[in-house]
UniProtKB/Swiss-Prot annotation:
The lineage of its organism: Eukaryota, Metazoa, Chordata, Craniata, Vertebrata. Keywords: DNA-binding, Metal-binding, Nucleus, Receptor, Transcription, Transcription regulation, Zinc, Zinc-finger. This is Retinoic acid receptor beta. It comes from Gallus gallus (Chicken). Residues 47-66, 424-434 have a biased composition (Polar residues). Residues 44-78, 416-455 are annotated as: Disordered. Heterodimer; with a RXR molecule. Binds DNA preferentially as a RAR/RXR heterodimer.
Length: 455
């Protein structure tokens, strides 16, 4: 029986593919090969003695056997055919093997593992029935995770993986958890500086207040809105500067840099303003020192988002996060391979891994008696994403409330956050998503000085 020489290329199980070529075969594979081909039996069959000949003596048999083995060696067994897996059950991309109970590609395997290990809670911005395939799999994390469960991926398999790793000696694990390597220490220091130099802390600001609509809520105070929109534009530019200073961020494609910035900008804006919350006065302070109470924040444009933001700020207080932790959490929010429409999600994931490790070690060294603080802080990303989704909707309604046009950088960065389609095309017919104005390479000192919102 001969074996077909035509095989399908299978990605290496341990490899990380950043580009997935179009499959050169139909989506449905032939049946999985059930077993290996039998080795050749040539030379192993016994030959009956020739009729009429006497039975040879044992010595003669041994001599003949030895001579035969020397003259006619048995050919080697043929190599088994390469194993061919069915396509990924989740997205139909090329599978790298069976992961967590089903045939899956590296991308869906990693997505499922991260989602379970981090207890991620996703939101679908459509009807919870998104099509998940090789092209659309990064567009809706909620529906992708549901598809993983539907095809049979097992939570327990992920947990068992983690339990295997925990079987290492306790002393070695403890040492690894608390030891900051030189590389991670350098990474942590760079991110701390990037955060502090793009976001002054509350104690560095000269706080000032305004009496404008301070005691009653209105739909929109235009004076406060003008001031808030000016400050928000400057904050967005500072977030872009922060991103450019993160190690590895500028090595990503320009398209991926823009995708990540637009997806995480509102997350980081909310996280930053909430670290400047003063519970005694129930106020928040902006980067120029302007301090607004809850009512004024509502009237400045936050509207129905106000109470969500203040609740989140109160939840941050017991965590007592310092600048290093806030900077690392901001970087993790930004550099996230689960964002929609990334060209190189695996590369983004690789950049995020040392950030997670650095935050874990830093938190455990700073709070050795609070081992659960790392997952508590990390889970704040889920809360931020939930608030940001509502924030993007708020930007859309604000367009109808303000008398003039929305400041371009706010509209471009916040309205088109992940899960929201751009509403208005540019003059050349392209959507704002592809506008070069928010390219990280274009937001430097010269472009800031030329921006009409900062002059």
């Amino acid at each position: 029986m001969t074996t077909s020489s035509r095989t399908c290329p299978v990605p290496a199980v341990n490899g990380h593919m950043t580009h997935y070529p179009a499959a050169p075969y139909p989506l449905l594979f032939p049946p999985v090969i059930g077993g290996l081909s039998l080795p050749s039996l040539h030379g192993l069959q016994s030959h009956p003695p020739t009729s009429g000949c006497s039975t040879p003596s044992p010595a003669t048999v041994e001599t003949q056997s030895t001579s035969s083995e020397e003259l006619v060696p048995s050919p080697p067994s043929p190599l088994p055919p390469p194993r061919v897996y069915k396509p990924c059950f989740v997205c139909q991309d090329k599978s790298s093997g069976y992961h967590y109970g089903v045939s899956a590609c590296e991308g869906c395997k990693g997505f499922f593992r991260r989602s379970i290990q981090k207890n991620m809670v996703y939101t679908c911005h459509r009807d919870k029935n998104c099509v998940i395939n090789k092209v659309t799999r990064n567009r809706c994390q909620y529906c992708r995770l549901q598809k993983c469960f539907e095809v049979g991926m097992s939570k327990e398999s992920v947990r068992n993986d983690r339990n295997k790793k925990k079987k290492e000696p306790t002393k070695q694990e403890s040492t690894e958890n608390y030891e900051m390597t030189a590389e991670l220490d350098d990474l942590t220091e760079k991110i701390r500086k990037a955060h502090q130099e793009t976001f002054p802390s509350l104690c560095q600001l000269g706080k000032y207040t305004t009496n404008s609509s301070a005691d009653h809520r209105v739909r929109l105070d235009l004076g406060l809105w003008d001031k808030f929109s000016e400050l928000a534009t400057k904050c967005i530019i500072k977030i872009v500067e922060f991103a450019k200073r993160l190690p590895g961020f500028t090595s990503l494609t320009i398209a991926d840099q823009i995708t990540l910035l637009k997806a995480a900008c509102l997350d980081i804006l909310i996280l930053r303003i909430c670290t400047r919350y003063t519970p005694e006065q129930d106020t928040m302070t902006f980067s120029d020192g302007l301090t607004l109470n809850r009512t004024q924040m509502h009237n400045a444009g936050f509207g129905p988002l106000t109470d969500l933001v203040f609740t989140f700020a109160n939840q941050l207080l017991p965590l007592e996060m310092d600048d290093t932790e806030t900077g690392l959490l901001s970087a993790i929010c930004l550099i996230c391979g689960d964002r929609q429409d990334l060209e190189e999600p695996m590369k983004v994931d690789k950049l995020q891994e040392p950030l997670l490790e650095a935050l874990k070690i830093y938190i455990r060294k700073r709070r050795p008696n609070k081992p659960h603080m790392f997952p508590k802080i990390l889970m704040k990303i889920t809360d931020l994403r939930s608030i940001s989704a509502k924030g993007a909707e708020r930007v859309i309604t604000l367009k109808m409330e303000i008398p003039g046009s929305m400041p371009p950088l706010i509209q471009e960065m916040l309205e088109n956050s992940e899960g929201h389609e751009p509403l208005t095309p540019t003059s050349n017919g392209n959507t704002a998503e592809h506008s070069p104005s928010i390219s990280p390479s274009s937001v430097d000192n010269s472009s800031v000085s030329q921006s009409p919102m900062v002059q």
